[in-house]
From Swiss-Prot:
Positions of short motif 'HIGH' region: 10-20
SUPFAM superfamilies per UniProt: An anticodon-binding domain of class I aminoacyl-tRNA synthetases, Nucleotidylyl transferase
Disulfide-bond pairs as recorded: none
Matching CDD domains: GluRS_core
Compartments where located: Cytoplasm
Recorded family membership: Belongs to the class-I aminoacyl-tRNA synthetase family. Glutamate--tRNA ligase type 1 subfamily.
Family matches, as HAMAP family: Glu_tRNA_synth_type1 (MF_00022)
Gene: gltX1
Protein's job: Catalyzes the attachment of glutamate to tRNA(Glu) in a two-step reaction: glutamate is first activated by ATP to form Glu-AMP and then transferred to the acceptor end of tRNA(Glu).
Record-linked InterPro entries: aa-tRNA-synth_I_cd-bd, aa-tRNA-synth_I_codon-bd_sub2, aa-tRNA-synth_I_CS, aa_tRNA-synth_I_cd-bd_sf, Glu-tRNA-ligase_bac/mito, Glu/Gln-tRNA-synth, Glu/Gln-tRNA-synth_Ib_cat-dom, GluQ/Sye
Keyword Zinc assigned: no
Enzyme class: ligase
Originating organism: Methylobacterium sp. (strain 4-46)
GO cellular component: cytosol
Protein name: Glutamate--tRNA ligase 1
Amino acid sequence: MSSVVTRFAPSPTGFLHIGGGRTALFNWLYARKHGGRMLLRIEDTDRERSTEAAIEAILDGLSWLGLDWDGDVIYQFARAARHREVAEGLLAAGRAYRCYASPEELTEMREAARREGRPLRYDGRWRDRNPSEAPPGVRPVIRLRAPVEGETVVEDEVQGRVVWQNKDLDDLVLLRSDGTPTYMLAVVVDDHDMGVTHVIRGDDHLTNAARQTQIYHALGWTVPSMSHIPLIHGPDGAKLSKRHGALGVDAYRGLGYLPAALRNYLVRLGWSHGDQEVFSTEEMVAAFDLKQIGRSPARFDFAKLENLNGQYIRATSDADLVAAIEAILPSQGPARGLPARFDDALRARFLAAMPGLKERAKTLIELLDSAYYLYAPRPLALDERAEGLLGNGGRERLAGVLPRLEALPDWSAASTEQAVRDFAEAAAVKLGHVAQPLRAALTGRATSPGLFDVMAVLGREESLGRLRDQARAA
């Protein structure tokens, strides 16, 4: 299927939603699997709500996720003349008609339907009337002359065969009274003109599929293959919302998630491939199949994403993690007293410490916070637990072990560990009773990477300086 063309078509009214990110991923994977193309169309016809900032956020979010699109970005609003041309063609062919119903008539129509418990549908009153009967001063809309008998059927790759009775579908508006095209018309025309072969989108568009299928049939165009994927719900089964947590791809970026980890997590929301949970990009492309997408809503498990991100952090090279940390410094550094860029010395220190740092961190933010000891100014600010470890004789034990450390001819993880063990044995105390005050004095925290690795990374002068600061406070 080398001619496969998919598209991701977001509306630029806000950030790139996590659900939109998954939709883009599924379109990207399907296109890449079949050697096809994924196009990007910005559906910016709602001029009041569409913003340049939102467009930038969408493009940036897709790029960060590693989802490259093919060709130039297409802007729907710029194609309005083409949409009008198609509507006028349907009108000329008798497949559409001008409707002169006034806003007051339409309001009364809806209210009558509510009173009588009927669906809110346009009643077709101008379907067969002569335009010469049009009331003065009413600018018409153009409506599709939809079939009133039979069925409209969508053979959906995910949902299966979906059938609508045509009597339940009214004559939808194609062109508004001001000449602007509706979403339904614009999507069909754009997908056709762009050569889209496969429409993969959220199942909240399933009813739209029936409407759009009718437009395709009226135009005599081939209906693309359709796949309506289940929406993402929160852990409680309710539709994902702000109360569940972060919603935008940019928020997860800011929280310190790796794009590869988020991509991996998103692909497993609604799609499965046996029991496999962790996929490289190449494995995703090779395995992806629309038939393996379920119909039930996928539940977003924040803890599972966090654990998966931790796996990715541990599997990422130390140099790449340092680069990832540097990428978030402009937003995360100032609050921690860090510059927007590492100097060579601090970069080298981070690189040396990374094997220990990444063992416990589940996000880049956690990793940066656990690296506090690398960049903390002296004297270190101690958290409450660290302060507790230095009480009850902790500082005295620091003062006792200092001479042994100061006398070391060679400073390394192995030599410092041996010196501390020798002191603990000579003082007849448990190793932990010496190691924990040392950890607190060196890192300002009660937990850290391996203590002696910390000492090796900090080096002799910085380590001894921090220990003397706290020993003197005894």
